[in-house]
């Protein structure tokens, strides 16, 4: 295996060594290109500009070169948020490429604005572009700027792009079989799936939904549901789609959190998206948006405290302060209303709009009346099961008893209620509720019981001993079905536990456990069928007759079990009951002396018990425990969602009367029926068009009301979005904290500012500007200079020619401060430390100057500041590097006597204005001197410890003022 990595050599010293070499070598940068990228990294505007100008003339630098990290100069400027250098590079037509995507990923808003407004000038000579191969790009071809901005969820960048009217590809349906989807999947299935995931990841961005959707809440509902369904199809990316679905749910919930009044909450929850339903005046204030949330399983939205507060107010309408009452008072009130439900129902039948009729229509009263009616039905079932009315047990077709006659109206009322619910909500919505399926099964069993009793009453007359009845006698089947329906009717009462905060989570956990049991039964049935087939195959030949067994009994129900595996059905029963320990081991014996057969049978029976009891049963317990823990972790949300579904069933119009009063036609029902019959079969002529004009007027009024309601909804949504965005930005700044990136940005700002100040003070006037190829060489050169006591070591450097030579410079501030700190190299450490003690006030002034440049502070007083260079370079090294000892004494004194005000120092003056006194001439090794200056400056910048200890106060003041400005900027934009 080692031969794959190195070539075997014969000489011993390197026999146990693996020679390493770069296999995939990249093109090395030239020294000029390294210096160019280094200047961009440091923020040296003048050097970058000079390098770009020389590149246009001499072509000595490839301005599109990349560093080992694959970053071009433009990308480095974007990463450092240096907009001035970015603009300079764009003016020289550098290759843009994925710079916009890179700026969006780095969330540099200024760079995005600059790149969006950038247009390549036509007719000019352009530098050949690189990186044209998309294989080396950091972004896949399907990623667009708006998609990447949506992935980062940067509100400001998304707003900039949306204002440019960008678009996002519309994803096809989940199970779309169009030509485009099929061909894309066949060509590259991975790219097709990834592209779909990237599109949905962009569409699920809260900022994008808030900006581009007219109804962001409904959009979040539908998108969350679609992503949940897509996670079931794209199993490979199931976790990603589920995370996006949860993100949409949380966005809708967070948006509802911003509601500040009951009016805003009502406008949101009562808004309809279906215009045909909006024109119906009777359907206002029916919580349409909340119904949509329940339909799409938006549990977080439904369980939101604001939503629950409004629902509780509507639920306890007419009972102010209900929750503050004692539980005894609540119990007595509920029992009183429950006992009075027949009278309240009769009052509603007679006069629906009376006080009692309106009282029973309240949701809480309706719930109590329906519960009392169902408890009465269960009480009658209990009376029927106890046979309080004695009848002849041997009558084959017994007539109905008094209790059964009393049960019949309730059964008919239940059936009529289910028919109305299916008619109002639709068949699809009806079958999605498991309790409706249970009601359907229960009502079907009651109908089958009634039908079989009628058949037995008509067909069979007289009495006969029950022991002599045939097995499929109608009365026997009816009794069995009635017993099963009694069980289902009693269990149906569990649905009412949802209204209680203590029993509700238990009821939800029970429902989840039933799902686990169904999953478990699939595996268990497979194991059961496998062992049943094998045991039946083994013991089929040893079946005996009933007359050969004791008491003429055959099967496992006998006192002495036998023939447990003689048939397949008997084998299935035997294995099932063996799980509960109801089968003995001797059933594996045979009358013949076939010990091998008995051993194989006993081994198979034991293996089945180990698998079913030890493995499968414990797996079922673990699954049920997991389901319960999942509900317990989200007990509050799950219970509130289930309770809301229960409450919403009583908020709707209709279904006011409980069984059996709901089967009695009311006067209102006769009125509705008469109007329908009159309009359908006896249409009246309208020669004058009065009815048509009346319908047009009413339609216009309803449409106007709909527009007003929609306008109010849009105003509320606009306010919610503003509050949400403000809270999102505020939370992101709070959670961001102080990171390493902040220190890097601060260091970059200080470096750029240093070069700007050097240009302003006129210290960068030499003919040649030298740069080392790496920061390591710079630091090594500084160490060499310090140790040699002024001796200059020759090192390789790269120079950019400066076009203009100036004979005068703005140097007096620097020269006035230099003698003060000492120009000799022989100073002691104590003296040097004392000389640095006065640097604090200078740094404070430097911070004020920096704030002034950034526009966050008012301009300070324009009094002269002569110690600005103390915070820029260390005076000792500057003095040592420049070697002013070689200068003429008269010229130095003349320069030291000149004064200049810092507020008057500008870049144009530094480059174009000449002073009356000439600056000192450069030494013979001026190129090397300037390189040493850069070494000192680089050493200062690379030492983060010195920077943050010395410039602490100014940086703190700078960051404080910058933070205040950012908050004001965010508030202004919002």
UniProtKB/Swiss-Prot annotation:
Cysteine pairs bridged by disulfides in the record: 553-558
Keywords of this entry: ANK repeat, Calcium, Calcium channel, Calcium transport, Cell membrane, Disulfide bond, Ion channel, Ion transport, Membrane, Metal-binding, Repeat, Transmembrane, Transmembrane helix, Transport, Zinc
An example Gene Ontology biological process: phosphatidylserine exposure on apoptotic cell surface
Positions in the Extracellular compartment: 385-404, 455-476, 536-603
Cellular compartments per GO CC: plasma membrane
Annotated binding of Ca(2+), by residue: 418, 421, 436, 439
UniProt keyword Disulfide bond, yes or no: yes
Cytoplasmic side: 1-325, 361-363, 420-433, 498-512, 625-974
Main location per the UniProt record: membrane
Known role: Forms a receptor-activated non-selective calcium permeant cation channel. Mediates calcium-dependent phosphatidylserine externalization and apoptosis in neurons via its association with PLSCR1. Acts on distinct neuronal populations in the hypothalamus to regulate innate behaviors including feeding, anxiety (flight/fight/fear), socialization and maternal care.
Protein name: Short transient receptor potential channel 5
Native organism: Bos taurus
């Amino acid at each position: 295996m080692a031969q794959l990595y190195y070539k075997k050599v014969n000489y011993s010293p390197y026999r146990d060594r693996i020679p390493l070499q770069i296999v995939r070598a990249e093109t090395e940068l030239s020294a000029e290109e390294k210096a160019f990228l280094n200047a961009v990294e440091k923020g040296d505007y003048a050097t970058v500009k000079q390098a770009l100008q020389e590149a246009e003339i001499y072509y000595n630098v490839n301005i599109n070169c990349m560093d080992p990290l694959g970053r071009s100069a433009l990308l480095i400027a974007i990463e450092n948020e240096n907009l001035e250098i970015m603009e300079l590079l764009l003016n020289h037509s550098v290759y843009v490429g994925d710079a916009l995507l890179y700026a969006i990923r780095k969330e540099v808003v200024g760079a995005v604005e600059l790149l969006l407004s950038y247009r390549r000038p036509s007719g000019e000579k352009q530098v050949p572009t690189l990186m044209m191969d998309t294989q080396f790009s950091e972004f896949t071809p399907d990623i667009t700027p708006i998609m990447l901005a949506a992935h980062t969820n940067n509100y400001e960048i998304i707003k900039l792009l949306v204002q440019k009217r960008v678009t996002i590809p519309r994803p096809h349906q989940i199970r779309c079989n169009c030509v485009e989807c099929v061909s894309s999947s066949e060509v590259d299935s991975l790219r097709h799936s990834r592209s779909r995931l990237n599109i949905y990841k962009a569409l699920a961005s809260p900022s994008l939904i808030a900006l581009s959707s007219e109804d962001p809440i409904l959009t979040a509902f539908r998108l969350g549901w679609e992503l949940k369904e897509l996670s079931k199809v794209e199993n490979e990316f199931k976790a990603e789609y589920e995370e996006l679905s949860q993100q949409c749910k949380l966005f809708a919930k967070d948006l509802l959190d911003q509601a500040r009044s009951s009016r805003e909450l009502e406008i949101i929850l009562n808004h309809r998206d279906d215009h045909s339903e909006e024109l119906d005046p009777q359907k206002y204030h029916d919580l349409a948006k909340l119904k949509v949330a329940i339909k799409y399983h938006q549990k977080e939205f439904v369980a939101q405290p604001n939503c629950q507060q409004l629902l509780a107010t509507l639920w306890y309408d007419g009972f102010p302060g209900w929750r503050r009452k004692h539980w005894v008072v609540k119990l007595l009130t509920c029992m009183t209303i429950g006992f009075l439900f027949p009278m309240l129902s009769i009052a509603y039948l007679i006069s629906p709009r009376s006080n009692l009729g309106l009282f029973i229509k309240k949701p809480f009263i309706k719930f109590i009346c329906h519960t009392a009616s169902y408890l009465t039905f269960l009480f009658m079932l209990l009376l029927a099961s106890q046979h309080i009315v004695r009848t002849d047990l041997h009558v084959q077709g017994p007539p109905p008893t008094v209790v059964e006659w009393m049960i019949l109206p309730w059964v008919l009322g239940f059936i009529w209620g289910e028919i109305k619910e299916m008619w109002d909500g639709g068949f699809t919505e009806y079958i999605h509720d498991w309790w409706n399926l249970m009601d359907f099964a229960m009502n079907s069993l009651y109908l089958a019981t009634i039908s079989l009793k009628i058949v037995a009453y008509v067909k069979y007359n007289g009495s006969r001993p029950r022991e002599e009845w045939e097995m499929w006698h109608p009365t026997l089947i009816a009794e069995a079905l009635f017993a099963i329906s009694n069980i289902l009717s009693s269990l149906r009462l569990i649905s009412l536990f949802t209204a209680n905060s203590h029993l509700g989570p238990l009821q939800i956990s029970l429902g989840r456990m039933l799902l686990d049991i169904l999953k478990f039964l699939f595996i268990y049935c497979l194991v059961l069928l496998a062992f049943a087939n094998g045991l039946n195959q083994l013991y089929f030949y040893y079946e005996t007759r009933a007359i050969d067994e004791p008491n003429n009994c055959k099967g496992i129900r006998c006192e002495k079990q036998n023939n447990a595996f003689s048939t397949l059905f008997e084998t299935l029963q035997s294995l099932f009951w063996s799980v509960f320990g109801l089968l003995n081991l001797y059933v594996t014996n045979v009358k013949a002396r076939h010990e091998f057969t008995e051993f194989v049978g006993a081994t198979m029976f034991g293996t089945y018990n180990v698998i079913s009891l030890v493995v499968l049963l414990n797996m079922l317990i673990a699954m049920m425990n997991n389901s319960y823990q999942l509900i317990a972790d989200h007990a509050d949300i799950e219970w509130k969602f289930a309770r809301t579904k229960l409450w919403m069933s009583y908020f709707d119009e209709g279904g006011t009367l409980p069984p059996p009063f709901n089967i009695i036609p009311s006067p209102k029902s006769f009125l509705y029926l008469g109007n329908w019959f009159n309009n359908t079969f006896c249409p009246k002529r309208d020669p004058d068009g009065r009815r048509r004009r009346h319908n047009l007027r009413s339609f216009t009024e309803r449409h106007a009301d709909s527009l007003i309601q929609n306008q109010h909804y849009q105003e509320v949504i606009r306010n919610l979005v503003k509050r949400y965005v403000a809270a999102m930005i505020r939370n992101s700044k709070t959670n961001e904290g102080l990171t390493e990136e902040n220190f890097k940005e601060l260091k970059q700002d200080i470096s750029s500012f240093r070069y700007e100040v050097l240009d302003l003070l006129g210290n960068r006037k030499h003919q040649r500007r030298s740069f080392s190829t790496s920061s390591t060489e710079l630091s090594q050169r500084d160490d060499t200079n310090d140790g040699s006591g002024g001796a200059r070591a020759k090192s390789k450097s790269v120079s950019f020619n400066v076009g203009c030579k100036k004979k005068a410079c703005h140097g007096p501030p620097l020269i006035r401060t230099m003698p003060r700190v000492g120009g000799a190299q022989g100073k002691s450490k104590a003296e040097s430390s004392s000389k640095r003690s006065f640097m604090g006030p200078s740094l404070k002034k430097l911070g004020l100057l920096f704030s002034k440049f950034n526009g966050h502070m008012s301009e300070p007083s324009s009094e002269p500041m002569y110690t600005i260079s103390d915070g820029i370079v260390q005076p000792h090294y500057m003095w040592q590097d420049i070697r002013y000892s070689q200068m003429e004494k008269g010229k130095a004194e003349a320069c030291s006597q000149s004064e200049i005000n810092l507020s008057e120092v500008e870049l144009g003056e530094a480059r174009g204005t000449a002073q009356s006194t000439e600056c000192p001439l450069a030494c013979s090794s001026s190129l090397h001197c300037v390189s040493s200056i850069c070494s000192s400056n680089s050493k200062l910048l690379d030492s983060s410890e010195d920077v943050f200890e010395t410039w602490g106060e100014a940086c703190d003041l700078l960051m404080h003022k910058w933070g205040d400005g950012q908050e004001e900027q965010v508030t202004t934009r919002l």
